[in-house]
């Protein structure tokens, strides 16, 4: 058996086209959706991510602002800039690119973003709303994964879902969204005993660990849907995920590739969240 490939590029393109249509309609009403992306330092990977996000927004008709600051920017200055963006009516979404330099408290910086402009969904208020099943914004990567599962017609109600990785950015919100969809959810972390025993139970397996090719085909239930959130460079210098694609593809029923899987969906859902933030400004 060779797994069906879940094409994140094609799905994200359809979502971007829908965003462009809705953004044009909103702009015609006098509100052009606006996203501010804040980058501190010169991390090469972060620069690529930010460039891709800004380009995607502009292509879809959203107003985007990139604010780049030196790595030695003080926390007070960064917080002051976020406060100014909070008060700027032309900006509906604010994204601070992580990771931040070590001297900056990422929790404090995220908490400084107005919850209604927190399009990453990381603010503690938005995390709480997600936990209670009333999300204002769904974090972009888990949101993108849910859209991929939906596009594949995956039945989540009653399914065994296993999430490998328990970060605040992917693992925990991913588990909450799967739980809300009716799945029975197991979250695995670095302390999990016999990880393979857990992953082999999964009808839906989501992996977000940052460890190249750690999930191999013998750890996967035959026919499972495998979502690989990881993006790493292997020893050969090539991009790879947290799942060993070659062996997993022989066992899984469907699988996301790296690149071309979850990554494009993350950017697409950032645009959706920004659009929704702008649309809410027209709602009394």
From Swiss-Prot:
Detail which positions bind NADP(+). Answer: 165-167, 190, 231
MF terms (GO), sorted A to Z: methenyltetrahydrofolate cyclohydrolase activity; methylenetetrahydrofolate dehydrogenase (NADP+) activity
The entry's cellular-component GO terms read:
cytosol
Q: Could you mention a single GO BP entry for this protein? A: methionine biosynthetic process
Q: NADP among the record's keywords?
A: yes
Output the Pfam families linked to this UniProt entry.
Answer: THF_DHG_CYH, THF_DHG_CYH_C
Write the Enzyme Commission number(s) for this entry. Answer: 1.5.1.5, 3.5.4.9
Substrates-to-products reaction catalysed: (6R)-5,10-methylene-5,6,7,8-tetrahydrofolate + NADP(+) = (6R)-5,10-methenyltetrahydrofolate + NADPH; (6R)-5,10-methenyltetrahydrofolate + H2O = (6R)-10-formyltetrahydrofolate + H(+)
Q: Does the keyword Amino-acid biosynthesis apply?
A: yes
Which InterPro entries is this protein grouped with?
A: Aminoacid_DH-like_N_sf, NAD(P)-bd_dom_sf, THF_DH/CycHdrlase, THF_DH/CycHdrlase_cat_dom, THF_DH/CycHdrlase_CS, THF_DH/CycHdrlase_NAD-bd_dom
What domain of life does the native source organism fall in?
A: Bacteria
**Keywords from the named record:** Amino-acid biosynthesis, Histidine biosynthesis, Hydrolase, Methionine biosynthesis, Multifunctional enzyme, NADP, One-carbon metabolism, Oxidoreductase, Purine biosynthesis
**Subunit relationships:** Homodimer.
Q: What does this protein do?
A: Catalyzes the oxidation of 5,10-methylenetetrahydrofolate to 5,10-methenyltetrahydrofolate and then the hydrolysis of 5,10-methenyltetrahydrofolate to 10-formyltetrahydrofolate.
Q: Which family does it belong to?
A: Belongs to the tetrahydrofolate dehydrogenase/cyclohydrolase family.
> Which PANTHER family has this protein been placed in?
C-1-TETRAHYDROFOLATE SYNTHASE, CYTOPLASMIC, C-1-TETRAHYDROFOLATE SYNTHASE, CYTOPLASMIC-RELATED
Q: What is the protein's name according to its record?
A: Bifunctional protein FolD
């Amino acid at each position: 058996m060779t797994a069906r490939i879940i094409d994140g590029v094609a799905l994200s393109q359809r979502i971007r086209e829908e965003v462009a249509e809705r953004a044009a309609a909103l702009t015609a009403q006098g509100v052009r959706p606006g996203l501010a992306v804040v980058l501190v330092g010169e991390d090469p990977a972060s620069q690529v991510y930010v460039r891709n996000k800004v380009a995607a927004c502009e292509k879809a008709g959203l107003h985007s602002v990139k604010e780049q600051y030196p790595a030695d920017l003080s926390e007070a200055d960064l917080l002051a800039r976020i406060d100014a963006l909070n008060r700027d009516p032309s900006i509906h979404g604010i994204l601070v690119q992580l990771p931040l330099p070590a001297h900056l408290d990422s929790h404090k910086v995220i908490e400084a973003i107005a919850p209604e402009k927190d399009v990453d969904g990381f603010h503690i208020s938005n995390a709480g709303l997600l936990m209670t099943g009333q999300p204002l914004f769904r974090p972009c990567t888990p949101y993108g994964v849910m859209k991929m599962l939906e596009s594949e017609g995956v039945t989540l109600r009653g399914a065994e879902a296993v999430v490998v990785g328990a970060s605040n950015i992917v693992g925990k919100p991913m588990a909450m969204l799967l739980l809300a969809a009716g799945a029975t959810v197991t979250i695995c972390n670095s302390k999990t005993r016999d990880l393979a025993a857990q992953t082999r139970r999964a009808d839906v397996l989501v992996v977000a660990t940052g460890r190249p090719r750690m999930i191999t085909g013998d750890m996967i239930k035959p026919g499972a849907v495998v979502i690989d959130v990881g993006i790493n460079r292997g020893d050969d210098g090539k991009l790879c995920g947290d799942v060993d694609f070659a062996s997993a593809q022989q066992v899984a029923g469907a699988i996301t590739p790296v690149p071309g899987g979850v990554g494009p969906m993350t950017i697409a859902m950032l645009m959706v969240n920004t659009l929704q933030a702008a649309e809410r400004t027209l709602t009394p």
